[in-house]
Curated annotation (Swiss-Prot):
InterPro entries: PXT1
Name of the gene encoding the protein in the UniProt record: Pxt1
Protein name stated in the entry: Peroxisomal testis-specific protein 1
Keywords annotated in UniProt: Peroxisome
Gene Ontology cellular component annotations, sorted alphabetically: nucleus; peroxisome
Subcellular location: Peroxisome
Amino acid sequence: MQLRHIGDSVNHRVIQEHLAQEVGDVLAPFVALVFVRGQVLLRFFWNNHLL
């Protein structure tokens, strides 16, 4: 009985980690895009001495 409970909790944790990894894989390109756009915007303001 205890072993089945331990197996169920391990399986639940693996599923949660897999979902978290999928969310990270989906969000990574968007985060990179925002970071690059932020750099471009800061460079534009810096070059035009607006900062």
